[in-house]
């Protein structure tokens, strides 16, 4: 079977749940810290005096998160790599080269897994470094803003605190920028990084297995509702070697056992395609071995009534559901909690309508949870 990023999505989701739980815990910590002694005339003074306690609690959450995710990521990478390798075995199992691959008893490529684990550590290190500072700085700003707002507007301290907490919950812990310059909140950034690195592990397991049996070409699937980044590579043949750019090669016909040759148009290298955006987070394309004379181009899948823009509207609704769930976690009283819950239900109803109106869409409840990547 071909390999695709989707092969490792469940592994990334399991790690993402750790970030999801941490994000909820941090919002609740902040809300409880602000709510304590909220009726006291010395509220602002007491809040500033308790910053040390809040910092300690946040650091405990961040340390526990890092310990849990380090081991979980390593296990996910090994599993993803093995899945990619087994996909190559399943794909070629009926052929002589497939039986040769299946007979090999090969452990995961330790250097490859180590390299990916190090890359993941580099990508997520800013998350742990920023958590404590972001939460404590937000706490200071809210205390200062609430004190000033009361004097200027006359609204209650609880109302002002809730308004500030709602704004923070809408944004999440922000300030994380990926290689493309896009800004992410903490949980979304971390899960995006996990999804990317586990997808890479699955693909590397697959291409390492192909390299062992000297298969040097792969072909990209034709996925419905593709994005502009992937569209140029759909159905194209790519080399696992270093050659770049479109070129044509003549190769032995596998069906004729090498007695004849066939012309193969190669669109570029896999490295080149990935650098251009193929297999980005959320990519639904797959990659299969290309055997001259055996492999045919994938069929096109029409999607009448559903467009790529409809998939992006689904992503937008998912973000709004997550936003209001964060507002639930940040609620300081029952009134705010009830209002946020009503908004969650309203956007969930809109999601049901949107999916029902577009037959090619499938609802993904896990992407509506706090902490799911965008």
Positions of the model-derived regions?
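N-terminal leader/targeting and assembly helices and adjacent pre-domain segments
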Residues: 1-169, 293-294, 301-374
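Short hydrophobic/aromatic-rich motifs at helix boundaries and adjacent loops
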Residues: 136-137, 178-179, 199
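Hydrophobic/aromatic-lined pockets within catalytic cores
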Residues: 147, 151, 169, 173, ...
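Hydrophobic alpha-helical scaffolding
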Residues: 154, 180, 184, 188, ...
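Short, glycine/acidic-rich hinge or "gate" loops at secondary-structure transitions
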Residues: 154, 158, 176, 180, ...
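Long, charged/polar-rich coiled-coil alpha-helical scaffolds that serve as structural arms
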Residues: 159, 163-166, 170-175, 192, ...
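Acidic, glycine-rich two-metal-ion catalytic cores of nucleic acid-processing enzymes
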Residues: 184-292, 300
